Each structure stands twice: as structure tokens, then as C-alpha cells.
Design a protein with these regions (language model features):
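Active-site metal-binding motif and surrounding structural segment of the metallo-beta-lactamase
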Residues: 82-87, 93-185, 327-345, 356-362
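Short acidic, S/G/P-rich loop/turn micro-motifs used as interaction or catalytic elements
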Residues: 94-96, 150-154, 192-194, 258, ...
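C-terminal motif of bacterial Sec signal peptides marking the signal peptidase cleavage site
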Residues: 16-19
Length: 454
């Protein structure tokens, strides 16, 4: 079965356009009823009134919105900066668990949200179209790929159609980027510099991504940039740069390099690219792709947010450099909220890192039935006994597993839904909203806060 969503509509439209001569960019979809929304120049004193059972109000100028979009097929985060600048960090595109056997030894996926018939890229696209601010004009100012795994940037499979002129498979990042003009495309750089064990296995998914990036550069002027580790001027507000000086995005890590805490300097503990290539994929010292993940520190006033892709510490007892969280911990501080590294699974979110971060709110983007893990959530609770845990998915199998391991599921604030953090313009407080993910109405099912920032 092939997906019959928006992605297929793109193909038909592009075929018509190609007959007019020359390659043309596929147009962004206009949201019915939102062509010219009324924008108030006044920053409200409190968050727009969000009521349980009603659709979450749209972003307001001055606020920082962080949306965890739940497709059940990976990880995707949509950011709206205080001036309306938009950024999509990852667009998970693993195959739906309902139609894909992940193989012996691998845990099955969770149910697709809202259902398996809507491609993950379409779920993400619909979400962005609904919440995107007027100032963005239906485009993405930034699109970022944390690392080169299918549950973050997509996979190539006959399940998905191909772009008629670009030749790339329309899934995940490529599908969203074909529909919405992208200003800058940010990633860790070339797949083989440094290489991970995944690079030796297959470059098919990465090659598809590169093909999309080249098409986007030609068709819509997208600029692909390697994340500059240590920089705080690469991801900035582009619509009203002077709107506030209390907002900052610091690039903490990418490609195995980590900010040192001094200026914009970065360093790596990994073997050189030449050494890693010489090792080959089977060498015990070889690093997995997760270690190459992009990590960011996002700040608005006293509010701090940490996101680290699939950063982990697996294998550190033998090879210390495989613990990418250790050097990150040295340059971080306590945060109000964070995305759990690697979907809150095992061998990640170390006690050493959490002793520094001590988040008040944890968002776990789980998409397999072994996520989140009891021992990992317990580490969060030990670091901050008051932490609120929000998971995008929790299967019945995992509920039974957690219970058998003595973890109280009632300790979790949410076990399904899109999770939205909305930070007040002052950066002094924030709210958390859980949105119903069983359809695309974006109604609030739970509301929390305000939480004060320290």
C-alpha cells in the first residue's frame, strides 16, 4: 500500500507545473480561514486562555512555543520563537508499527497517530500549518536534523512516493520540506565526517536527504549549513531580531563535538575521522550515530530548555568517548524543561547529566513499546523529586513492564498526546498543554501551570 496523503497531491501538482517549462517550487499550502489572521501588536500579560476540551489558542507575539508533535513514528519538535521565527527540529519518518516488522530482537512500534493512513510527514505538515504564525508566511525559517536515523529524518521505502522532479522519496524531512519553503537546513554535516557505524551499514537514507537538500537549494533557495558547535548566532530570530535580548539558542553539540564553555570553542573526544574509518563498522570502538546528535540550549529570560537528540553513553565503561553526555554536562546548568535524550530509553540521560540539568518538566518522545524506561525515569526523579513527566506514547505492554518493575505509572502527568510548552514573554513562567492526538483538532486534554522559572 502506498500513502495517499498530501504527499501524493504534491506529485500531481508538480507534474502540472513541470509542463509549463522549467522547474518550479511546490507551493506551500494555505490554511483555509487563516489567509490574513488578525495580529495584535500588544503582548498579553497572561497566556491566551487555553481550556480543556477546546482547541489550543495560537501563539502570541513575545511567547516561546515548543511543540512535541506525536506521529507515533519518531520524533518531531516545532518551535516558534518570540518574534514568530519558526524551526522544525526533526520530522520522524520511521515506518508505521502497524505495517512494519522491526525484526527479531527489536521492540515493536506504538500505534500511529492519529492513524496509519496519514503519513507522518502529513501529520507534521498539518500541525505546522495550523499553528504557524502569520509572520512566517507559511514557510519554515529553520529545519534541523539532529542526526541521521530514520525516526528523526526519514527512511527510503517503496511505501512512500517519489518527488516527480527532485527524484527523492517523499518522507519525513524531505516531504515536509517539499511542501513548505525552508530558509536554512541545519545538520551535523557530512555523514562520513566523522563516520558512525551506521554510515558503514547504509547511506541510502542519507543520500535521499542530500538529494532533497540539493533540490531545495535550487528550487526554493534553501541554504544547507553545518551546525557550528558553540555558536549562539546561527539560530536567531529573523523577523524581529531586536524584539528581545533575553532569547538565545546555543549550539551545544554536533558530530561528536561539544562546546567547551569558552567563547564559541568546541572540542571532541572521539577518534579522528581517519581512525574511525579505519576501524570499520564491527570494531568495538566504533561510535553509533546517536553520539553524533545535535544538542541545543534554548533560553528565554529565566526559562531554560535542553534538547539533545539521541545523545547517550552506551559503551562508556570501555570507551569513555562514547559518553557524549559527560562533556555536555560540564557546560550546562539547571533547566526548567528538557526533551529526554534518545526517547527516554536505556543507556541515556545519565545520572551525571541529570544532576546538572534537574528539569522540572520532562518530555519523552517515545515511539517504541520499550520507551520510556523505568530506570531512566527513576533517574530523573532522583535528580528532581518534583519533576513532571510527559510521555507522548505508552503501550499496554510497557505499562505492564513498568508495573512489574515497581514504577508507578500514576507518577506520569501524561502518557499520550502532543505536548506543548508555552513560555511567557518575560521568561518568568511557563505552561504545559497536552493535546489530543487521536485526530487533528488540537484540542487541549490536560493543562498544567504556570510553573515559575528560576
Amino acid at each position: 500500500m502506498r500513502y495517499q496523503g498530501i504527499t501524493c497531491a504534491f506529485i500531481l501538482l508538480a507534474a502540472l507545473l513541470s509542463g509549463c517549462g522549467g522547474e518550479k517550487r511546490l507551493p506551500s499550502v494555505v490554511i483555509p480561514g487563516k489567509e490574513k489572521p488578525e495580529v495584535t501588536p500588544v503582548v498579553p500579560e497572561e497566556t491566551p486562555d487555553a481550556k480543556v476540551g477546546e482547541v489550543l489558542p495560537l501563539w502570541s507575539e513575545g511567547y516561546l512555543d515548543i511543540h512535541s508533535i506525536n506521529t507515533g513514528r519518531g520524533e518531531s519538535y516545532f518551535y516558534i520563537f518570540p518574534d514568530g521565527t519558526t524551526m522544525l527540529l526533526d520530522a520522524g519518518g520511521a515506518l508505521p508499527g502497524e505495517v512494519h516488522d522491526y525484526g527479531e530482537g527489536n521492540s515493536p512500534g506504538v500505534p500511529s497517530k492519529p492513524n496509519k493512513d496519514i503519513p507522518a510527514a502529513d501529520v507534521i505538515l498539518h500541525y505546522i500549518q495550523h499553528f504557524s504564525p502569520e509572520v512566517s508566511k507559511g514557510a519554515l525559517d529553520y529545519m534541523m536534523v539532529s542526526h541521521y536515523h530514520s525516526d528523526h529524518f526519514g527512511s527510503v521505502n517503496s511505501f512512500f512516493p517519489s518527488h516527480p522532479s527532485g527524484g527523492f522519496v517523499l518522507n519525513s524531512v524531505a516531504a515536509v520540506g517539499a511542501a513548505l519553503k525552508v530558509g536554512k537546513l541545519l545538520d551535523r554535516g557530512e555523514f562520513d565526517d566523522p563516520p558512525s557505524s551506521d554510515w558503514f551499514s547504509s547511506t541510502t537514507n542519507y543520500n535521499n536527504y542530500v538529494k532533497f537538500a540539493k533540490w531545495a537549494a535550487t528550487s526554493q533557495g534553501t541554504v544547507r549549513e553545518k551546525v557550528r558547535v558553540g555558536a549562539n548566532d546561527q539560530i536567531v530570530m529573523v523577523h524581529k531580531p531586536s524584539a528581545t535580548d533575553a532569547f538565545e539558542v546555543r549550539n551545544l553539540a554536533a558530530g561528536g563535538y561539544v562546546w567547551t564553555g569558552t567563547g564559541t570553542e568546541s572540542a571532541t573526544r572521539l577518534p579522528s575521522t581517519a581512525e574511525l574509518k579505519k576501524m570499520g563498522s564491527s570494531d568495538a570502538g566504533q561510535c553509533g550515530e546517536n553520539v553524533m546528535s545535535v544538542a541545543l540550549h534554548v533560553r528565554l529570560g529565566a526559562f531554560d530548555w535542553f534538547t539533545g537528540g539521541d545523545c547517550q553513553y552506551n559503551g562508556r565503561s570501555t570507551y569513555a568517548y562514547k559518553d557524549i553526555e559527560a562533556p555536555i554536562a560540564k557546560v550546562m546548568k539547571k533547566v526548567e524543561a528538557m526533551k529526554a535524550n534518545h526517547h527516554c530509553t536505556a543507556n541515556t540521560n545519565s545520572a551525571e547529566l541529570l544532576a546538572v540539568l534537574r528539569p522540572d518538566v520532562l518530555v519523552a518522545s517515545s515511539w517504541r513499546d520499550v520507551q520510556p524506561r523505568a530506570e531512566t525515569m527513576t533517574r530523573f526523579i532522583k535528580a528532581n523529586s518534583e519533576v513532571k513527566i510527559f510521555a507522548t506514547n505508552l503501550t499496554d505492554n510497557n505499562k505492564a513492564t513498568l508495573a512489574s518493575q515497581g514504577f508507578d505509572i500514576g507518577r506520569m502527568s501524561a502518557i499520550s498526546g502532543h505536548i506543548v510548552l508555552r513560555v511567557h514573554p518575560s521568561g518568568s513562567r511557563f505552561w504545559v498543554y497536552v493535546l489530543d492526538d487521536s485526530d487533528e483538532s488540537y484540542k487541549v486534554s490536560k493543562a498544567f501551570g504556570p510553573y515559575n522559572c528560576q
